[in-house]
Amino acid sequence: MNLSRAGRAANVCAMARFGQFCPIAVACEVFAERWTPIILRELFAGSHRFNEIHRCIPLISRPLLARRLRELEAAGVIRSTPQQKGKSREYHLTESGREFRAAVDALGTWGQRWTLRVNPENLDSGLLMWNIRRRTALERLPPRRVVVEFEFRGVPAGRSMLKKCWLILERTGSDVCVSDPGFEVDVYVDADLAAMANVWLGDLPFAEAVRQKKIKLTGVPALVRAFPDWLLLSHFARVPRPPAEFPAAQR
């Protein structure tokens, strides 16, 4: 017996079963497991290594993340390849997996339009910073390295998350540091975490957050003025909101 094939079959069988041949039911056996849509979100966003995926989904245990990745591979949604150095692997979407893009985008659009999102229970400064790293217009930067220091106020009590971090920006790439990288800081961002999340989601204009003193920028004047234009915001920031009579419109 092929043990590798048997292992893949066992992973598929571990998924929830609806007992129906309907294509929606069968697809949900793969897609609707807890955490799976979020894992797919990260793969679509460009995370390919285990630690990269886990960094943006810190509440999933590492064993459960490993299990979900095995299940997705067994279902033909992703493929994994060993890295040249070490024992870690890279995960990439297959053609089958890439077809989930429309479903993931539709979930994000629905969530942006119809749900109340920013509250103390779902604030996550780490996810916010990783998204800012991904969605910064590097081509708008000056032709040198720019260092932006973020310090967040209003971090919910009892939550373990970043309160200070550094965004390292260059035209060739960007990174987030959770400890002082030792570079001279060009722009300081002192922000209320909820306000910064609302700016990112398109619910609060950056200039209005500054006017309300929820975000304060200091540093090199020319870079401070340019900083808001570097932020591309969430992919879903332009999704139209519901009519005012709907509860989700009361933000």
Name each region found by the language model.
Residues 96-174, 221-251:
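Acidic, aliphatic-rich amphipathic alpha-helical segments
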Residues 65, 69-75:
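Basic amphipathic alpha-helical segments that dock to polyanions
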Residues 182-251:
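C-terminal interaction segments
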Residues 149-207:
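Low-complexity, glycine/alanine/valine/leucine- and proline-rich hydrophobic stretches
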Residues 32, 84-106:
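Basic, amphipathic "hinge/linker" alpha-helix immediately C-terminal to the N-terminal HTH DNA-binding motif
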Residues 1-15:
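Short, intrinsically disordered or compositionally biased N-terminal tails of bacterial proteins
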Residues 22-60:
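N-terminal helix-turn-helix DNA-binding core of bacterial DNA-binding proteins
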